[in-house]
Amino acid sequence: MKAVLIMGSTFDEPHAKKITDKLDDYGISWEQHAASAHKQPLKVLEILKNNESEKDLVYITIAGRSNALSGFVAANSEFPTIG
């Protein structure tokens, strides 16, 4: 199992740290990215493309305000998205 965290911005780091600490506790591998669905949609799509060959994967999105990131990731990936 692998978790890919995508934050809307680096300002979301403190919240992401809480999540990655728990993933570490459970022995789940993870990677973390900062990419805005509004300002960097191509970067988000690149992250999704780079992980499309994974077998067991979940996306965890962290974004404030409109939270377009969760919907954008869910709409462009076959893997579950938690946002």
Language-model segments: residues:
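Glycine-rich phosphate-binding loop
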Residues: 47-83
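N-terminal beta-loop-helix "entrance" segment that forms/cooperates
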Residues: 28-54
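Short glycine/serine/threonine-rich phosphate/pyrophosphate-binding segments
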Residues: 12-17, 41, 66-72
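Glycine-rich phosphate/diphosphate-binding loop of Rossmann-like nucleotide-binding domains
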Residues: 1-37
